[in-house]
Amino acid sequence: MMKIITSYIYRKGMKQIMHKKLVFLFIGRTASGKSSLARYICETLGLRQVKSITTRLPRKDEITGYEDHYFVSESKFDEIKFKEGFVAYTEINGIKYGTTYNEIVNSDIYVIDPNGAKYLKEHCKDEFKFIEIYFSSPFELAKDRFLKRDGSEEEFYSRYNSEDEQFTKYEEAEGYDHLFVNDMSFSKAAEALCDLLKSEMEKEKSL
């Protein structure tokens, strides 16, 4: 059984930002397409994605320079945690993940789970304006995507089941700003998502 320990540490003494930084939160189950689309959107629109710090090793499909994480040793992770603090910290099966405040300040898109998004919206609302986009895909399509990236059915079901409780609650609450049903080709999904983000950024400029 997958063991998940989640806690959040908000660094004290942070200066309040007068104009709220706009950050898009990409949330979705395993293989919903959120991470691939986030990378494409960043390249296309010139945006930057939050990269969390982790003690796990890179996967074989994580291309150098395009990873969603900074891979560090246990000692380096603890050093960063002590010196900078983490806005969010999660431990999954003994593997640690953390995100610093400055990383979010300097980024535009954050691929995050529902619990992390809830915490950020509750504790960082004075510094950031978060727009929450929930990526939903049909079960069989998500499984097919997962298998095409060299994952196994066993691994897919394990991940899907381990995240089911928090996502079921999240889906029932419907607290997101946009529901993005990703049941289309990558190119069509990318085009639709680009239009959505550009629209939101234009609204922000007009304020």
Label each residue range with its predicted role.
Residues 35:
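Walker A/P-loop
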Residues 32:
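ATP-binding Walker
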Residues 54-116:
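ATP-dependent small-molecule kinase phosphotransfer cores
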Residues 109-113, 127-147:
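Conserved phosphate-donor/acceptor-positioning beta-strand/loop module used by diverse small-molecule
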Residues 151-195, 207:
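Small-molecule kinase domains that catalyze NTP-dependent phosphoryl transfer to phosphate-bearing small molecules
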Residues 26:
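Hydrophobic anchor at the beta1->P-loop junction of P-loop NTPases
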Residues 29:
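P-loop (Walker A) phosphate-binding loop of NTP-binding proteins
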